[in-house]
Amino acid sequence: MEAVVTSSQTVRAEVAELLGIEESALDPDADLIASGLDSIRMMSLSGRWRKQGIDVRFAAMAANPTVAAWTRLVGERTAESPGAATQSGDTAASAGDPDAPFPLAPIQHALWVGRNELTELGGVAAHLYVEFDGAGVDPERLRTAAAALAARHPMLRVDILGDGMQRISDRDLPVKVTDLRHLDVADAEQQLEVIRHAKSHQLLEGEVLELALTLLPDGRTRLHVDLDMQAADAVSYRNFMADLAALYRGAQLPELQYTYRQYRSAFTATPAPTVDEDRRWWTERIPDLPEPPALPLVPRAEQRDPRRGTRRWHFLDTDIRDRLFAAARARGITPAMAFAASYAGTLARWSTSRHFLLNLPMFGREPFHPDVDKLVGDFTSSLMLDVDFTEAHTPAQRARVMQEALHTSAEHATYSGLSVLRDLSRHHGSPSLAPFVFTSALGLGDLFAGDVTDQFGTPVWHISQGPQVLLDAQVTPFDGGLLVNWDVREDAFRPGVIDAMFAYQLAELERLAADDAAWDAADPPAVPPAQRAVRDAVNDTGARRSDDALHDGFFRTAAHTPDATAVIGSTGTLTYAELRERVLAVTGALQVAGIKPGDTVAVMGPKCADQVTALLAIHAAGAVYVPIGADQPADRADSILQTAGVRMALACGDEPPTFLPALTIAEAVRVGSRVHGVTPATVEPDRVAYVLFTSGSTGAPKGVEVTHAAAMNTLEFINDHFGIGPSDRSLALSTLEGDLSVLDVFGMLRAGGSLVVVDEAQRRDPDSWARLIAEHSVTVLHWMPGWLEMLLEVGGALPSVRVVPTGGDWVRTEMVRELRRAAPGVRFAGLGGATETAIHNTICEPGELPREWSAVPFGRPLPNNACRVVAADGADCPDWVPGELWVGGRGIARGYRGRPDLTAERFVVHDGRTWYRTGDLVRYLPDGQIDFVGRADHRVKISGYRIELGEVEAALRRIAGVEAAVAAVLTAPGDGRGEQLAAIVRASSPAVTVDELTRRMAELVPPHMVPSHIALVEAVPFTVGGKIDRRAVTAELTRSMAERANAQAPTYRVPSTALERALADIVSTVLDRDSVGADDDFFELGGDSVLATQAVARIREWLDSPGVMVTDIFAARRVGALARRLVDHESGSDRLEGVAELYLEVADMNSADVASALHSTSAQASR
């Protein structure tokens, strides 16, 4: 046993060694962070002491980073654990037969499993590929050096076996030579590019290191080094490349007296004393750990090449490095954490959440033997960091948050990050990954030593990639400065995202190096200049503005074309002159009743053509209208009347309400016809035109005050854009409570066209709509998407319809295609908007519908409007990043009547402008269009993951045969799993099945976004207002889930064959369960890659099935399917069944039976 040393001199010596300085130069009271000691080396030292049984915690070291303080800590902890000692290299030297297989290290195992296509983000080898551009490298000398290198480092000859073990082989390390000296320079470069592309993405099979040399014109050479990082980590790469260079120049290297195999044996034999405590600490935090950063990703099934890796890199020179390091250390921040914070801050800016999980690889070697630092192998571990930048708004604040997160996690680092991820997977019931990685090689020395570049040339191309990683950001010393690399799964990200992110981080690093004040300054905009230019162009607030009030256009038309048809209703037709006469009569009646400009008048009762007269008359009196439909509950109607401050009411029908001053519209016409000299009032455009009451999130009505100017901005654009004129007729389907009625009434009558009014008896009947369209040759349908869906389901041609602007809900692309078939030549547009944005605020008029669209985007802002996509901290989101839609400009409402608190909350001032916060989650596309993602109040959390229901719906709609989909969250009856994700789907064909939908969703979205229940329906329910009826959807799903629960009581298929029974016994043992059915899912029962490896090892040994692989368990998942795969491997079941019966016979024995059988066998053998 090696005594633990606690003297000041020893602590000082260890720290001096880590800093690379003489012990005498180290002041015991100096701040070690300011002296250059980084977090990674501090963690290594803490881990070394804890391995020795001295419980010195990393956080305690970081709190007071001096040699003197650490000496006291070591002394105190040693006194508490007087028996502290560590196993020496000698006692650990025996590691069994050196030719026998030995277990993979945890990171090795994860990389091995990740090569499997069936794992999420898998099918990729962890490899590092580098090209050295040099001159005069001799192929034979290189071959000789390579052979010596392979002999020196056994791990460069390792075989990774199918059961999760590894074994050292006796193969050599060949060098492939390609001679391109006969080509000209251009052709040689082209061939180099071909070689590079092949090697950058290859899966090495049967070898872990490939050396190749290309001979180029003019004596140049290119050395290609491709390493499978299952065999060696980055520090090991540096080691063997330095050895290769030394061997190439003829140096004699002393033989290593220790092996990686021995190291792993010693490591396993000396677990950290705090591992159980650390496991408990992490277990308590599992439910609260965040998900990875939610960046703009492309569904895997839509990626061109899911495995393609690319690299972005940038070199920071010595001056920038030194200034960054000095500024960080002056703030008590290690340089590694400064770089980590810059990377994480960039992720936060492109993520929908500023609270996420980050993966940090850690490099550390226990000093079991003097040769440990010279070995080649995998010595890495991982650390999960809970990063929360919610309240961190400057680079310095983020760096402190990162450093504190590191200190917290490092305190409990003996329980590995991989173990944490496995625990998370079990907690969530689906695979949990941490695919965003930050790798710091600061303090580890140059990856490419000077001797390496002297012998082989300058590294001109390098890339690394790994399974289950989307983005690995690295910072490493290089050529006197720092190399900042991003290795990216390129096609996983939306176009332009990675380039914008990388540029943003580099700009921050250079800003922090140049200006010390930048560390404490707010962040600059993340929207790149090119994206800003596109947004400036589409957010045009300088278009022509009308000073008209809403009713002015009607009166001009009535003066110019009095005999034209204005209104067509179920009771008759009115010309413009007739309508004007009725309007002025009702205006007179209002004046007689004491209504003054600015007063509020309700329009009540069932939908009817007379309501057109009422609206125009109220405005002609200078008043404000408030519609209240016939189907409003009495309490709600009373609340609206009180909040709006209604002075009187005009009502459709024969009987006016009795609870306030009121007239029927017909009575108002009679009363007003006796009033002479009535003229329409002149109303300033900034006066309120109407108050529409909508339901808030609490269900309480809120009255939106919309001015004439705001509504006119939308109305004029629609009329001008679509050329709506005297020959047009629109079918007015919307009730007055829906703001589409504003365009129906005031827009059409301003244009001189005719309004065909659907009455109360017809407004729920699509057959009546189709008849009215045909009968009156309707040309314009300004409708909700749900109404169009209902109309198209009725069927039939719509030859007269030429313009269909629709908005207010999702617009299916397939519905647009159906509409174009029914109405050839129709001009269709999808519009985004809300009552608070004066009906519409964006427009998308698509030509050919792109295949990848599942719904029509909101589009671009209307003239005189502007749109922002805003993150939770108020900053503008870059392209593709979802945020809340804010709308500003002429077309927004004044606020909420009688609710100054709500007005202040939803109508906010930013940069001197008022913006309406819509609550819609949207994203800017690169062409300036705004794409609807979902509602903020439809953002839910399932199994610890935040989910946008709109994203789930969009993914479902991308599946062939799906016409419509609506997602919801609800609790299954009698189910103990809590809230679940569910969806209804309307399909175009009976061939679309729930199983097929589930399978395709698994290809498009992460597991937590795949609905656990899907119900196929004949129709999606809509409200009377034409929007998806989500309450009805929830009711339908609740009913469907209850039916399924009743029909599918938990089933358990007993394993039927001997092989199934044997496999079930092995699997149940590995999973620590009483029993496993033939159709039970291994992973749903709590299995993971480590347990799968254990199961494979036992199946190989106990069932004599050496061909079984971990991939078989990933593919089969169930005992029954696994049995079939094993039989297929052997082209028959007889032998396996016999072995399984023997296994079961032994498994059923008790210990006494086994001892007796062994004794009997021994006795027979002796005879």
Swiss-Prot record:
Residues 78-100 are annotated as: Disordered. 4'-phosphopantetheine is transferred from CoA to a specific serine in each of the two carrier protein domains, leading to their activation from apo to holo forms. The modification O-(pantetheine 4'-phosphoryl)serine is found at residues 39, 1089. Residues 575-967 are annotated as: Adenylation. Residues 98-390 are annotated as: Condensation/cyclization. Keywords: Ligase, Multifunctional enzyme, Phosphopantetheine, Phosphoprotein, Repeat. The keyword RNA-binding does not apply. GO terms for biological process: amino acid activation for nonribosomal peptide biosynthetic process; lipid biosynthetic process; secondary metabolite biosynthetic process. Pfam families: AMP-binding (PF00501), Condensation (PF00668), PP-binding (PF00550). Its EC number is 6.3.2.-. Pathway: Siderophore biosynthesis; mycobactin biosynthesis. Belongs to the ATP-dependent AMP-binding enzyme family. MbtB subfamily. Involved in the initial steps of the mycobactin biosynthetic pathway. Putatively couples activated salicylic acid with serine or threonine and cyclizes this precursor to the hydroxyphenyloxazoline ring system present in this class of siderophores. Modular protein that contains an aryl carrier protein (ArCP) domain which bears a phosphopantetheinyl arm to attach the activated salicylic acid, a condensation/cyclization domain involved in the formation of the oxazoline ring, an adenylation domain which activates the serine or threonine residue into an aminoacyl-AMP ester, and a peptidyl carrier protein (PCP) domain which bears a phosphopantetheinyl arm to attach the activated serine or threonine. This is Phenyloxazoline synthase MbtB. It comes from Mycobacterium sp. (strain MCS).
